[in-house]
Design a protein with these regions (language model features):
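Basic nucleic-acid-binding interfaces
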Residues: 2-39, 48-82
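Major-groove recognition helix of helix-turn-helix-like DNA-binding domains
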Residues: 42-44
Length: 82
């Protein structure tokens, strides 16, 4: 199982939202085909075919748990990563 698959599984499980590294969340979004633009400490991800814009910011080296949940909901809603 690749690192990406492990990260995707961790995000989809919903049990490790507090322990997801920001760089790992970025890796998953990049692999899912999201485009990123940066404005200050805000990383704004968009993808053709999705209505939502994902706006994430790091807290230290971790991703904010509520933002991991938002990413999970978008992955599930659009059936990405499978």
């Amino acid at each position: 199982m690749s690192q990406y698959e492990k990260l995707l599984r961790a995000i989809l499980s919903g049990t490790q939202d507090k322990n997801i590294l920001f760089s790992d969340l970025q890796l998953v979004l990049d692999r899912l085909g999201f485009d990123c633009r940066i404005k200050g400490d805000h990383f704004i991800y968009t993808k053709d075919g999705t209505e939502e814009i994902i706006n994430v910011q790091p807290i230290g080296n971790k991703a904010k748990p509520y933002q991991v949940k938002q990413v999970r909901n978008i992955i599930l809603r659009y059936q990405l990563g499978g």
